[in-house]
Amino acid sequence: MKLLGHKIELWAGLLLPDVSISGMSELRFPEEKPLLRGQDTEMESADTFLSAADTDWKEHDIETPYGMLHVVIRGTPKGNRPAILTYHDVGLNHKLCFNTFFNYEDMQEITKHFVVCHVDAPGQQVGASQFPQGYQYPTMDQLAAMLPSVMQHFGFQSIIAIGVGAGAYVLAKFALIFPELVEGMVLINIDPNGKGWIDWAASKISGLASSLPETVLSHLFSQEELMNNTELVQNYRQQISNCVNQSNLQLFWNMYNSRRDLEMSRPGTAPNAKTLRAPVMLVVGDNAPAEECVVECNSKLDPTNTTFLKMADSGGLPQVTQPGKLTEAFKYFLQGMGYMPSASMTRLARSRTASLTSASSVDGSRPRPCTQSESSDGIGQINHTMEVSC
């Protein structure tokens, strides 16, 4: 995507405007020093991301119109604040998908302000019983329609949704059906497109040529990651094979590959266009198999309330490989929504010079609030999609 025009410098938390051409923007963070601690270690052991820091979580099985949902929750609703609700990708569960991210040290500054609710897709949690033969797995639309039962059970008034892959699709569908229940969204590796007969046939052929775990791995990781057979890939191969019921996984995989198009359109591009109304942060690794799909999703969203985060040196699971960068971006996102105004941003502000280059599409009448670091007097407002490379 070609980015032109307007440039803004971010240094020590200050935005210094230059010339302007409205539109799409890109924010780059040159690496003067590693943002993540321990970057020489690719990932914790499999045991760590499956079991660490689980003592504060409480498990629930919640009845919904389309079957039972396994949910784990930490904390209690805090006044009128939304809950952070997550939904994992196909082949994973909440532990495999989110433990590394939510156990990251700097995330604790966020989670102490919100109740956190992880939803496992039916039959995908660790130790799940196998569904009986002939069981009809819920459609992707039905998976989205199960979530109001979760919110009602815990008394959530609204949510900030974090979804990855298939989970991002489910949460986007939920937000389209129940926009009043969603305050903000972080959508990682989302594919907004439906699967046609050609896609279905290709996935069938691929499935015949390889085992289910290998097929799922090709969805989660880039070809480069798979060819290098990194420690991360080896860990996930083992966990997908041993910690997720394979029969249940096959049902979820089949349903995800039968999904319909989300049918979103950027406002003003089509009569009666519908899109996500809440602020959205799209996230994808620059080496992820979903990169093109996320770029396409960005073209379907309202540019006045969308941030596009493209993470450098990150493959298919940025929440696992780059939890520090994603945590910091999530803090900015929450601050833009008016939450956590005093949260510390000093590490990013002190260690980086960022340039914001814009060029784009639609003039927005609603300003997108930017965040302030502890060292800044003020930051300007941005009225267009912001693409962030870090």
UniProtKB/Swiss-Prot annotation:
Q: Name one Pfam family in it.
A: Ndr
Disulphide bridges: none
- Keyword Cell cycle assigned to the entry: answer is no
Q: Name one GO biological process term.
A: signal transduction
GO CC aspect terms: cytoplasm; cytosol
Q: Which residues form the signal peptide?
A: none
Subcellular localization(s) per the UniProt record = Cytoplasm, Cytosol
Where does this protein have compositionally biased stretches of type Polar residues?
370-390
Q: What protein is this chain from? A: Protein NDRG4-A
